Amino acid sequence: MLFNNFLCFAVSAIPLVSAMPLGNAPYHHHHHAGLNASNITVGVNVTNTTAFSKRDGGFPDGVYDCSSFPDDQNGVVRLDYLGFGGWSGVQKNDGKYGTASTCQDNTYCSYACKPGMSKTQWPSEQPDNGVSVGGLYCKNGKLYLTQKDNSNLCEDGKGTAYVKNTLSSNVAICRTDYPGTENMNIPTNIDGGSKQPLSDVDEDSYYNWGGKKTSAQYYVNKSGRSAEDVCVWGNEGDDYGNWAPMNFGSGYTDGKTWLSMSFNPLSSAKLDYNIRIKSDGGSLSGDCYYEDGSFHGSTADSSGCTVSVTGGNAYFELY
Protein backbone atom coordinates (compact mmCIF):
# COMPACT_ATOMS: atom_id res chain seq x y z
CA MET A 1 0.00 0.00 0.00
CA LEU A 2 1.20 3.48 -0.80
CA PHE A 3 0.82 4.58 2.81
CA ASN A 4 3.16 1.97 4.22
CA ASN A 5 6.26 3.33 2.46
CA PHE A 6 5.27 6.85 3.41
CA LEU A 7 4.96 6.02 7.09
CA CYS A 8 8.15 3.99 7.22
CA PHE A 9 10.13 6.89 5.82
CA ALA A 10 8.50 9.35 8.19
CA VAL A 11 9.21 7.34 11.30
CA SER A 12 12.63 5.84 10.68
CA ALA A 13 14.21 8.42 8.36
CA ILE A 14 15.33 5.54 6.14
CA PRO A 15 15.61 6.87 2.56
CA LEU A 16 13.05 4.52 1.03
CA VAL A 17 11.57 5.29 -2.34
CA SER A 18 8.13 6.69 -1.58
CA ALA A 19 5.45 8.65 -3.34
CA MET A 20 5.63 11.25 -0.62
CA PRO A 21 8.54 10.93 1.84
CA LEU A 22 8.84 13.24 4.82
CA GLY A 23 12.58 13.60 5.24
CA ASN A 24 14.27 12.87 8.55
CA ALA A 25 11.48 12.62 11.03
CA PRO A 26 11.16 14.03 14.54
CA TYR A 27 11.68 10.55 15.93
CA HIS A 28 15.38 10.89 15.08
CA HIS A 29 17.76 10.16 17.95
CA HIS A 30 18.96 13.74 18.27
CA HIS A 31 15.39 14.84 18.81
CA HIS A 32 14.97 12.74 21.90
CA ALA A 33 18.09 14.40 23.25
CA GLY A 34 16.33 17.69 22.58
CA LEU A 35 13.65 16.85 25.09
CA ASN A 36 15.94 17.50 28.06
CA ALA A 37 12.72 50.51 1.08
CA SER A 38 10.75 47.97 -0.61
CA ASN A 39 7.13 47.05 -1.16
CA ILE A 40 5.13 46.74 2.03
CA THR A 41 2.28 44.33 2.65
CA VAL A 42 0.35 43.60 5.82
CA GLY A 43 0.61 40.20 7.48
CA VAL A 44 -0.97 38.61 10.51
CA ASN A 45 0.94 36.83 13.25
CA VAL A 46 -0.76 33.44 13.55
CA THR A 47 0.08 33.17 17.23
CA ASN A 48 -1.42 36.44 18.43
CA THR A 49 -3.30 37.84 15.39
CA THR A 50 -1.60 41.24 15.59
CA ALA A 51 -0.96 43.07 12.33
CA PHE A 52 2.57 43.99 11.30
CA SER A 53 4.35 45.30 8.22
CA LYS A 54 6.17 43.04 5.80
CA ARG A 55 8.93 43.83 3.31
CA ASP A 56 8.82 42.21 -0.12
CA GLY A 57 12.22 43.33 -1.38
CA GLY A 58 14.28 40.38 -0.19
CA PHE A 59 16.71 39.88 2.66
CA PRO A 60 19.99 41.86 2.46
CA ASP A 61 23.14 39.92 3.39
CA GLY A 62 25.18 41.20 6.32
CA VAL A 63 22.83 44.05 7.28
CA TYR A 64 20.68 42.66 10.09
CA ASP A 65 22.29 42.14 13.49
CA CYS A 66 22.08 38.59 14.78
CA SER A 67 20.26 39.99 17.80
CA SER A 68 17.59 41.49 15.53
CA PHE A 69 14.88 39.09 14.35
CA PRO A 70 13.88 39.85 10.70
CA ASP A 71 10.13 39.95 11.22
CA ASP A 72 9.76 42.72 8.64
CA GLN A 73 10.49 40.15 5.91
CA ASN A 74 7.48 38.92 3.96
CA GLY A 75 5.93 35.79 5.49
CA VAL A 76 8.26 35.57 8.50
CA VAL A 77 6.54 35.00 11.86
CA ARG A 78 8.00 35.65 15.33
CA LEU A 79 7.73 32.84 17.88
CA ASP A 80 8.58 34.70 21.07
CA TYR A 81 6.99 32.07 23.31
CA LEU A 82 9.79 29.61 22.45
CA GLY A 83 12.39 31.78 24.16
CA PHE A 84 14.85 32.14 21.23
CA GLY A 85 14.21 35.82 20.52
CA GLY A 86 11.58 35.08 17.87
CA TRP A 87 13.52 32.28 16.14
CA SER A 88 12.06 28.79 15.83
CA GLY A 89 15.41 27.31 16.82
CA VAL A 90 19.16 27.97 16.87
CA GLN A 91 21.79 25.34 16.00
CA LYS A 92 25.50 25.50 16.79
CA ASN A 93 27.81 25.07 13.81
CA ASP A 94 30.21 22.84 15.73
CA GLY A 95 29.77 19.47 14.06
CA LYS A 96 27.22 18.33 16.63
CA TYR A 97 24.59 20.98 15.81
CA GLY A 98 23.14 21.16 19.29
CA THR A 99 20.76 23.90 20.36
CA ALA A 100 22.02 27.36 21.32
CA SER A 101 19.98 29.71 23.48
CA THR A 102 20.36 32.76 21.24
CA CYS A 103 21.24 33.60 17.65
CA GLN A 104 24.96 34.27 17.98
CA ASP A 105 28.17 33.92 15.99
CA ASN A 106 28.65 30.56 14.26
CA THR A 107 25.03 29.45 14.61
CA TYR A 108 22.21 28.73 12.19
CA CYS A 109 19.09 30.67 13.14
CA SER A 110 15.85 29.14 11.90
CA TYR A 111 12.51 30.88 11.58
CA ALA A 112 8.81 30.24 11.03
CA CYS A 113 6.76 31.29 8.02
CA LYS A 114 3.05 31.98 7.97
CA PRO A 115 0.66 29.13 7.04
CA GLY A 116 1.05 27.99 3.45
CA MET A 117 4.63 29.25 3.19
CA SER A 118 7.97 27.54 3.80
CA LYS A 119 11.41 28.84 4.70
CA THR A 120 13.94 28.99 1.89
CA GLN A 121 17.18 29.04 3.83
CA TRP A 122 19.45 26.09 4.66
CA PRO A 123 23.10 25.31 3.84
CA SER A 124 23.46 23.18 0.71
CA GLU A 125 26.12 21.08 2.43
CA GLN A 126 24.28 19.20 5.15
CA PRO A 127 25.81 17.05 7.93
CA ASP A 128 26.49 13.45 6.95
CA ASN A 129 25.22 12.09 10.29
CA GLY A 130 21.53 12.48 9.46
CA VAL A 131 21.03 15.77 11.29
CA SER A 132 19.47 18.54 9.22
CA VAL A 133 20.46 22.21 9.52
CA GLY A 134 18.43 25.22 8.46
CA GLY A 135 18.04 28.98 8.72
CA LEU A 136 20.17 32.08 8.33
CA TYR A 137 23.82 32.04 9.37
CA CYS A 138 25.20 34.37 12.01
CA LYS A 139 28.78 35.56 11.37
CA ASN A 140 30.61 38.49 12.96
CA GLY A 141 27.38 39.69 14.50
CA LYS A 142 25.45 39.83 11.21
CA LEU A 143 22.94 37.54 9.49
CA TYR A 144 23.64 35.96 6.11
CA LEU A 145 21.62 33.96 3.61
CA THR A 146 22.48 30.27 3.31
CA GLN A 147 20.79 30.01 -0.11
CA LYS A 148 22.22 32.99 -1.99
CA ASP A 149 19.98 32.53 -5.03
CA ASN A 150 16.81 33.20 -3.03
CA SER A 151 16.66 36.32 -0.88
CA ASN A 152 12.99 35.89 0.02
CA LEU A 153 13.02 34.13 3.37
CA CYS A 154 9.61 32.51 2.86
CA GLU A 155 7.99 31.13 -0.26
CA ASP A 156 4.51 29.93 -1.13
CA GLY A 157 3.75 26.29 -1.76
CA LYS A 158 1.66 25.12 -4.69
CA GLY A 159 -1.49 26.47 -3.03
CA THR A 160 -3.47 23.26 -3.49
CA ALA A 161 -3.84 22.02 0.11
CA TYR A 162 -5.52 23.32 3.23
CA VAL A 163 -7.34 22.40 6.45
CA LYS A 164 -11.05 23.15 6.88
CA ASN A 165 -12.28 23.22 10.48
CA THR A 166 -16.04 22.71 10.83
CA LEU A 167 -15.80 22.39 14.62
CA SER A 168 -16.94 25.11 17.01
CA SER A 169 -13.48 25.40 18.61
CA ASN A 170 -10.00 25.97 17.20
CA VAL A 171 -7.44 23.31 16.31
CA ALA A 172 -3.69 23.99 16.38
CA ILE A 173 -1.37 21.96 14.15
CA CYS A 174 2.40 22.19 14.42
CA ARG A 175 4.76 21.84 11.48
CA THR A 176 8.18 20.28 11.92
CA ASP A 177 10.99 22.84 11.55
CA TYR A 178 12.78 20.99 8.79
CA PRO A 179 15.53 21.30 7.72
CA GLY A 180 16.57 22.55 11.13
CA THR A 181 16.01 21.46 14.71
CA GLU A 182 13.08 19.30 13.53
CA ASN A 183 11.05 20.46 16.51
CA MET A 184 7.30 20.59 15.91
CA ASN A 185 7.00 24.32 16.62
CA ILE A 186 5.85 26.03 13.41
CA PRO A 187 2.23 26.89 14.28
CA THR A 188 -0.94 26.97 12.23
CA ASN A 189 -4.12 27.77 14.17
CA ILE A 190 -7.43 26.97 12.48
CA ASP A 191 -10.33 28.71 14.20
CA GLY A 192 -13.67 26.94 14.33
CA GLY A 193 -15.61 27.48 11.11
CA SER A 194 -12.53 28.61 9.15
CA LYS A 195 -9.72 27.22 7.03
CA GLN A 196 -5.96 27.70 6.74
CA PRO A 197 -3.50 26.71 3.99
CA LEU A 198 -1.02 23.88 4.37
CA SER A 199 2.55 24.11 3.10
CA ASP A 200 2.21 21.83 0.11
CA VAL A 201 5.83 22.17 -0.94
CA ASP A 202 6.90 21.41 -4.49
CA GLU A 203 8.90 18.29 -3.69
CA ASP A 204 10.67 18.38 -7.06
CA SER A 205 12.42 21.65 -6.19
CA TYR A 206 12.33 21.88 -2.38
CA TYR A 207 14.86 20.53 0.12
CA ASN A 208 15.91 16.93 -0.46
CA TRP A 209 17.46 14.59 2.07
CA GLY A 210 19.90 11.97 0.88
CA GLY A 211 18.72 12.56 -2.67
CA LYS A 212 15.11 11.90 -1.69
CA LYS A 213 12.21 14.32 -1.94
CA THR A 214 10.74 15.72 1.26
CA SER A 215 7.38 17.18 2.18
CA ALA A 216 5.78 19.02 5.09
CA GLN A 217 4.85 17.19 8.29
CA TYR A 218 2.46 18.42 11.00
CA TYR A 219 1.51 17.29 14.48
CA VAL A 220 -2.25 17.47 15.00
CA ASN A 221 -3.61 18.35 18.43
CA LYS A 222 -6.91 18.06 20.24
CA SER A 223 -9.36 20.92 19.78
CA GLY A 224 -9.45 24.01 21.96
CA ARG A 225 -5.69 24.24 22.56
CA SER A 226 -3.59 27.30 21.74
CA ALA A 227 -0.56 26.99 19.47
CA GLU A 228 1.63 28.48 22.20
CA ASP A 229 0.62 25.65 24.53
CA VAL A 230 0.87 22.70 22.13
CA CYS A 231 3.50 23.55 19.48
CA VAL A 232 6.27 22.76 21.95
CA TRP A 233 8.10 19.68 23.21
CA GLY A 234 6.06 17.62 25.65
CA ASN A 235 6.87 14.78 28.00
CA GLU A 236 5.90 11.14 27.89
CA GLY A 237 2.23 10.83 28.73
CA ASP A 238 1.34 14.28 27.37
CA ASP A 239 -1.11 14.62 24.47
CA TYR A 240 0.46 17.56 22.62
CA GLY A 241 3.61 18.54 20.74
CA ASN A 242 5.70 15.48 19.90
CA TRP A 243 3.07 13.44 21.79
CA ALA A 244 0.12 14.80 19.78
CA PRO A 245 -2.30 12.06 18.63
CA MET A 246 -1.98 12.50 14.86
CA ASN A 247 0.39 13.44 12.03
CA PHE A 248 -0.50 15.13 8.73
CA GLY A 249 1.72 15.12 5.65
CA SER A 250 1.35 17.39 2.63
CA GLY A 251 3.27 17.92 -0.58
CA TYR A 252 3.11 18.22 -4.35
CA THR A 253 4.96 16.07 -6.88
CA ASP A 254 4.40 14.48 -10.28
CA GLY A 255 1.53 16.89 -10.94
CA LYS A 256 -0.44 15.70 -7.91
CA THR A 257 -1.16 16.95 -4.41
CA TRP A 258 -0.51 14.34 -1.72
CA LEU A 259 -2.12 14.32 1.71
CA SER A 260 -1.51 11.76 4.43
CA MET A 261 -2.66 11.23 7.99
CA SER A 262 -1.41 8.68 10.49
CA PHE A 263 -1.34 7.92 14.17
CA ASN A 264 1.68 9.35 15.96
CA PRO A 265 3.46 6.14 17.04
CA LEU A 266 4.84 7.91 20.11
CA SER A 267 1.38 8.68 21.47
CA SER A 268 -1.60 6.72 22.78
CA ALA A 269 -3.80 9.84 22.88
CA LYS A 270 -6.85 10.12 20.62
CA LEU A 271 -8.33 13.15 18.91
CA ASP A 272 -11.71 14.46 20.04
CA TYR A 273 -12.96 14.96 16.47
CA ASN A 274 -13.05 13.21 13.09
CA ILE A 275 -11.11 13.92 9.87
CA ARG A 276 -11.78 13.28 6.21
CA ILE A 277 -9.59 13.97 3.17
CA LYS A 278 -11.65 15.71 0.50
CA SER A 279 -11.12 17.58 -2.75
CA ASP A 280 -12.43 20.84 -4.12
CA GLY A 281 -12.67 20.38 -7.88
CA GLY A 282 -10.13 17.56 -8.13
CA SER A 283 -10.08 13.79 -8.44
CA LEU A 284 -9.14 11.72 -5.36
CA SER A 285 -7.12 8.51 -5.77
CA GLY A 286 -9.21 6.90 -3.04
CA ASP A 287 -11.26 7.39 0.10
CA CYS A 288 -9.63 8.20 3.43
CA TYR A 289 -11.18 9.23 6.73
CA TYR A 290 -10.60 8.97 10.48
CA GLU A 291 -13.75 8.44 12.52
CA ASP A 292 -14.42 7.26 16.07
CA GLY A 293 -10.76 6.52 16.66
CA SER A 294 -10.05 4.42 13.54
CA PHE A 295 -9.05 4.90 9.90
CA HIS A 296 -11.44 3.93 7.13
CA GLY A 297 -11.58 4.04 3.34
CA SER A 298 -10.06 2.40 0.30
CA THR A 299 -6.53 3.72 0.99
CA ALA A 300 -6.55 3.11 4.76
CA ASP A 301 -4.89 0.56 6.99
CA SER A 302 -4.82 0.43 10.78
CA SER A 303 -2.16 3.15 11.01
CA GLY A 304 -3.39 5.73 8.51
CA CYS A 305 -3.77 6.51 4.83
CA THR A 306 -2.38 8.50 1.91
CA VAL A 307 -4.38 10.07 -0.92
CA SER A 308 -3.30 11.87 -4.09
CA VAL A 309 -5.41 14.50 -5.80
CA THR A 310 -5.21 15.40 -9.47
CA GLY A 311 -6.54 18.83 -10.33
CA GLY A 312 -8.32 21.14 -7.91
CA ASN A 313 -7.46 21.35 -4.22
CA ALA A 314 -7.08 18.76 -1.49
CA TYR A 315 -7.99 19.36 2.13
CA PHE A 316 -8.43 17.83 5.55
CA GLU A 317 -11.93 18.43 6.87
CA LEU A 318 -12.22 18.39 10.66
CA TYR A 319 -15.72 17.48 11.85
UniProtKB/Swiss-Prot annotation:
Keywords: Carbohydrate metabolism, Cell wall biogenesis/degradation, Glycoprotein, Glycosidase, Hydrolase, Polysaccharide degradation, Secreted, Signal
Signal peptide region: 1-19
Source taxon at top rank: Eukaryota
Protein EC: 3.2.1.-
Glycoprotein recorded as keyword: yes
InterPro entries hit by this protein: Beta-Glucosidase_SUN, SUN
GO cellular-component term (any): cell surface
One Pfam family in the UniProt entry: SUN
The UniProt record lists the keyword DNA-binding: no
One Gene Ontology MF term: beta-glucosidase activity
Catalytic class of the enzyme: hydrolase
GO biological process: fungal-type cell wall organization; polysaccharide catabolic process
Main location: secreted
Subcellular locations according to the entry: Secreted
Glycosylation, residue list: 36, 39, 45, 48, 221
Protein family per UniProt: Belongs to the SUN family.
Physiological role: Cell surface beta-glucosidase involved in cell wall biogenesis.
Protein name: Probable secreted beta-glucosidase C2G2.17c
Organism of provenance: Schizosaccharomyces pombe (strain 972 / ATCC 24843)
